[in-house]
């Protein structure tokens, strides 16, 4: 995914 995704551990996956 190329959208920021928020996870329960407080981290986020963004465009890399």
From Swiss-Prot:
Keyword annotations of the record: Adaptive immunity, Cell membrane, Immunity, Membrane, Receptor, T cell receptor
GO biological process: adaptive immune response
Coiled coil: none
Gene Ontology, cellular component aspect: T cell receptor complex
Location(s), subcellular: Cell membrane
Role played: J region of the variable domain of T cell receptor (TR) beta chain that participates in the antigen recognition. Alpha-beta T cell receptors are antigen specific receptors which are essential to the immune response and are present on the cell surface of T lymphocytes. Recognize peptide-major histocompatibility (MH) (pMH) complexes that are displayed by antigen presenting cells (APC), a prerequisite for efficient T cell adaptive immunity against pathogens.
Oligomeric form and interacting partners: Alpha-beta TR is a heterodimer composed of an alpha and beta chain; disulfide-linked. The alpha-beta TR is associated with the transmembrane signaling CD3 coreceptor proteins to form the TR-CD3 (TcR or TCR). The assembly of alpha-beta TR heterodimers with CD3 occurs in the endoplasmic reticulum where a single alpha-beta TR heterodimer associates with one CD3D-CD3E heterodimer, one CD3G-CD3E heterodimer and one CD247 homodimer forming a stable octameric structure. CD3D-CD3E and CD3G-CD3E heterodimers preferentially associate with TR alpha and TR beta chains, respectively.
Name this protein carries in UniProt: T cell receptor beta joining 1-5
